[in-house]
C-alpha cells in the first residue's frame, strides 16, 4: 500500500518498520512531528525529554540495554546532545541507534543554519541523507542495520524540505527485532585506557569498513545519461533540484550514504564525465573532500553557500537561465512581521518591562523572542536555549563593575526553564548575582506546536504525569524571593517588576497564564476559568492616540480616515491588555461566550 507522507511521517514509519522500541526527542522545527508520529505506534515507547542531551542519553541507555532506539532533534539541538554523542561514538552500540538531525537551511525557524553533516565527520560515525519521503522510511531501516553491523550510532541528516514535503511511500510491515540480553561490556566505561583502545578501533576498523561499505552500497548510486558531458554529485533535496533542471542532460552520482564518502566510486564517476558539479546546500561538505582527493569539480565557486537552494537558483548560476519574474509593486504589499498572537500572555509583561529604560532584557528561544520586534522593542538579546538567565547574570556583573544603574532581567519560557534554565538560575544564585530572572509559564511548549513538558502534567501519549512546580524548583535552587503573577493584570506586573529589581540578590518572577491557543485541560479550567470574551472600541470615546496599538496586538488596527481604532473580534479574546492601557477607557467587553476549551 502507498501513502502520501511527509518526511517526518516517513521517518516515524521507518522507525516502526525497523523494529525500534524506544524513541526520545525535544521538540524543535523542523523535527517536531517525528516523535509526534512515532507516538502513534503502540510498539514504540516514546517520550518528550527535557532537552536534547537527555533525549540522546536516554536513547543511548535503550541501546545499551539491547533495544533499537533513536533520538530526534533540530540542528541546534545536536549542539546540546554533542557531549553524549561524541563519547557514544567511541563506545558503539548494542541495539541499533540513530540520531536524527533536522537541519534548517534558510533559517525558517532557527537562530542559525549550521550544517550538521560535520558532526558525522567529527564523531567518526556513519551518516545517511534521504532525498524524499520514501527514502526517509527506507533509509531509517537501513540505518538501524548499519548501526548494528558496524557498531556505530548513525546520523540521519534531513532538512526542512525533506521533513515537511510530501511524496508517496510504499508501506511495509514491522520487523520484530528481539532485545539483546544485557551483558556488562567494558567499552561502556570510557576511562582513558579504554578510550584509547576504542579510538584506535574506530580508525583501524570502523572507518575502514564504513568506507568500503560506502563504495559498495546501493545507497550511493550512479545514473548514466546522454553523452556524459555533465556529471552531478548531490545528496538530499539538492539532488531533486538538480534532477529538475538538468533532467537527462546530465549523469548523477546520488549520495545517500554521505559519511564516509564513497571516494572510489566518486573517482570512477568523475573520470567518465567532462564537467563535474557538486550540488549541496550550505557548506561545501562533499566538495571539500572531493577536492582533497585531487578531483576537479565546480561547487561553491558558483553555488550559494547560504540559505536554501531551489531549481531557479541552480538554473541561474549553472545554466545562466532565469525563469520569467512577475513584476509587482512591493510598496503596496503590507509589511507583516511575525508577532505575538492576539491575547498572548507574554504581551502585557513585555509592555510593562520595556518601560524600564534602565533594564537590559536578556531573552531566550521561544515565542517571547518576538518581543524584540516593533512596537514592543523590549528585548536586548536572544542567543540559545537557557542563555536568557546566563547572559543576564554575566551582564549584571559587568554593569556592577562599571558602576552602571542598568539592571539585567533574564527571560525564558517554562519549557526552556526545564530544558536548560535551571542550571543558569543556579549560576546566578551560587555566584550572588542581583538579577531578576523571569519565567513565562504559559503551561505548554508553545512555539513548536503545544508539546507537553514536565510542567504540564501529561506525557506525549496523554497519560497523567507528575507536575513539576517552577516556583518550588526555584526555591530549591536557593532563590529566596519567588513571586507568581497574572501577566494580563498590568498593575500587578508593573509592581512585581519593581519588586524583583529591588533586591541585591537573585529574584524569580513567574508569569502564569496559558497560551491563548492552548486547548485547556480540566486543571487549567479550574485554575484560570472557562471563558472567552470579546472587546470592542467605543468610537465616541476613542481619541486615536494609539496607546493600545503600541502593545502590538494584531487584533487592533488604526483607521487613518476615521482616526479611530477598531478590534477584529475574530482574533480578540479579551485579554484586556489594550483596555488597561487606554487612557480614555474606550475599550470594554462586547459579549461573554461560555465556549472556551
Model segments located where?
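Conserved thiamine diphosphate
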Residues: 104-153, 159, 186, 190, ...
Amino acid at each position: 500500500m502507498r501513502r502520501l507522507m511527509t518526511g517526518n511521517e516517513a521517518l516515524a514509519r521507518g522507525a516502526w518498520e525497523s523494529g525500534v522500541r524506544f524513541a526520545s526527542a525535544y521538540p524543535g522545527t523542523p523535527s517536531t512531528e517525528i516523535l509526534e508520529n512515532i507516538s502513534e505506534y503502540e510498539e514504540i515507547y516514546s517520550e518528550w525529554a527535557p532537552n536534547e542531551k537527555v533525549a540522546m542519553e536516554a536513547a543511548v541507555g535503550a541501546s545499551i540495554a539491547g533495544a533499537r532506539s533513536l533520538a530526534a532533534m533540530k540542528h541546534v539541538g545536536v549542539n546540546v546532545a554533542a557531549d553524549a554523542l561524541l563519547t557514544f561514538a567511541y563506545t558503539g552500540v548494542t541495539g541499533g541507534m540513530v540520531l536524527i538531525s533536522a537541519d534548517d537551511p534558510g533559517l525558517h525557524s532557527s537562530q542559525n543554519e549550521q550544517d550538521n553533516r560535520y558532526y558525522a565527520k567529527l564523531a567518526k560515525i556513519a551518516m545517511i541523507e534521504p532525498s524524499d519521503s520514501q527514502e526517509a522510511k527506507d533509509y531509517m531501516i537501513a540505518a538501524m542495520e548499519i548501526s548494528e553491523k558496524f557498531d556505530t550510532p548513525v546520523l540521519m541528516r534531513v532538512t526542512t524540505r525533506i521533513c515537511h514535503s510530501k511524496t508517496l511511500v510504499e508501506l511495509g510491515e514491522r520487523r520484530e527485532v528481539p532485545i539483546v540480553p544485557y551483558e556488562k561490556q567494558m567499552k561502556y566505561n570510557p576511562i582513558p585506557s579504554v578510550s584509547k583502545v576504542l579510538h584506535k578501533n574506530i580508525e583501524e576498523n570502523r572507518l575502514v569498513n564504513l568506507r568500503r561499505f560506502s563504495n559498495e552500497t546501493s545507497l550511493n548510486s550512479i545514473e548514466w545519461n546522454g553523452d556524459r558531458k555533465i556529471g552531478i554529485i548531490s545528496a538530499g533535496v539538492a539532488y531533486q533540484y538538480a534532477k529538475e533542471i538538468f533532467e537527462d542532460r546530465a549523469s548523477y552520482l546520488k549520495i545517500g550514504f554521505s559519511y564516509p564518502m564513497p571516494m572510489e566510486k566518486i573517482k570512477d564517476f568523475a573520470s567518465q564525465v567532462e564537467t563535474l558539479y557538486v550540488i549541496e546546500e550550505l557548506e561545501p561538505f562533499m566538495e571539500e573532500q572531493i577536492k582533497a582527493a585531487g578531483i576537479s569539480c565546480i561547487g561553491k565557486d558558483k553555488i550559494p553557500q547560504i540559505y536554501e537552494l531551489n531549481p531557479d537558483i541552480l538554473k541561474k548560476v549553472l545554466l545562466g537561465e532565469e525563469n520569467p519574474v512577475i513584476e509587482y509593486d512591493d510598496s503596496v504589499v503590507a509589511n507583516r512581521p511575525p508577532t505575538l498572537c492576539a491575547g498572548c500572555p507574554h504581551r502585557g509583561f513585555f509592555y510593562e518591562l520595556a518601560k524600564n529604560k534602565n533594564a537590559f532584557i536578556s531573552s531566550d528561544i521561544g515565542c517571547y523572542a518576538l518581543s524584540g520586534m516593533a512596537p514592543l522593542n523590549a528585548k536586548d538579546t536572544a542567543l540559545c536555549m537557557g542563555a536568557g538567565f546566563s547572559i543576564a547574570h554575566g551582564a549584571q556583573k559587568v554593569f556592577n563593575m562599571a558602576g552602571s544603574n542598568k539592571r539585567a532581567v533574564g527571560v525564558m519560557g517554562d519549557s526552556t526553564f526545564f530544558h536548560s534554565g535551571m542550571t543558569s538560575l543556579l549560576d546566578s544564585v551560587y555566584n550572588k548575582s542581583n538579577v531578576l530572572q523571569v519565567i513565562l509559564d504559559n503551561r505548554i511548549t508553545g512555539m513548536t506546536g503545544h508539546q507537553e513538558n514536565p510542567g504540564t502534567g501529561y506525557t506525549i501519549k496523554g497519560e497523567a504525569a507528575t507536575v513539576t512546580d517552577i516556583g518550588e524548583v526555584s526555591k530549591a535552587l536557593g532563590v529566596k524571593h519567588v513571586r507568581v503573577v497574572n501577566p494580563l493584570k498590568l498593575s500587578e506586573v508593573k509592581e512585581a517588576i519593581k519588586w524583583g529589581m529591588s533586591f541585591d540578590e537573585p529574584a524569580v518572577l513567574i508569569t502564569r497564564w496559558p497560551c491563548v491557543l492552548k486547548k485547556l485541560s480540566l486543571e487549567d479550567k479550574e485554575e484560570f476559568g472557562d471563558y472567552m470574551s470579546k472587546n470592542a472600541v467605543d468610537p465616541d470615546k476613542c481619541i486615536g492616540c494609539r496607546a493600545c496599538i503600541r502593545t502590538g496586538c494584531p487584533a487592533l488596527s488604526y483607521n487613518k480616515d476615521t482616526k479611530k481604532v477598531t478590534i477584529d473580534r475574530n482574533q480578540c479574546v479579551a485579554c484586556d491588555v489594550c483596555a488597561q492601557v487606554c487612557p480614555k477607557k474606550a475599550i470594554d467587553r462586547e459579549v461573554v461566550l461560555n465556549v472556551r476549551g
